[in-house]
């Protein structure tokens, strides 16, 4: 079996496939596993369900540090899952899939990557997700805007928002997490919403050791 993508879905599928005794290859275009939790590093990035619910049912974690775990802790959990189920050597990083061809005679897939490698597999699973293509609004003047411009999916962690005048466009799942954090640092924050709603800080807290 060949799996494209080493985020939550790809890792879960890999664990199950390996447990079923299948030979396995997981191709990941990035330099690390994690998918969404590797890519997203914006302020306040965390799971929006309780941490103890945000794990594989077959690999539960009891020692989450917070009610809503941050991206770094979730990424660490995925690394632990990969090691616990022996997937590390099955994952090939920096392998971007460019072409797939199904051979009717052999009933095998031929999978070619950007690096020139070719893989053959009886089964191919796409686990690329739908959160890896940042979408910018089509606004006049956006391309010529001279100030700092960032997308929540490709956040520049080196840029300091302290004392800045900031505009956030949108109020989706990422926005409601980052808005309270940006508001703590920005000199002035304006949020542009198509459908107005209130944004409040999540009821988060650190867990105490027992």
Residue spans of the language-model regions?
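Rossmann-like dinucleotide-binding core of oxidoreductases
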Residues: 2-8, 12-26, 30-32, 118-119, ...
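Conserved beta-strand scaffold positions in the cores of enzyme catalytic domains, especially
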Residues: 53, 91-92, 147-150
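Feature captures the FAD/FMN-dependent oxidoreductase FAD-binding
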Residues: 66-132
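Tryptophan-centric aromatic hotspots in well-structured domains and transmembrane helices
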Residues: 8, 37-39, 64, 96-111, ...
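Glycine-rich active-site loop/strand segments that organize a redox cofactor
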Residues: 38-77, 196-210
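A short alpha-helix-loop-beta-strand transition element characteristic
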Residues: 39, 88-90, 188-191
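Short polybasic/polar patches that bind polyanions
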Residues: 18, 38, 83
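Intrinsically disordered, low-complexity boundary segments flanking structured domains
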Residues: 40-43, 80, 134-141
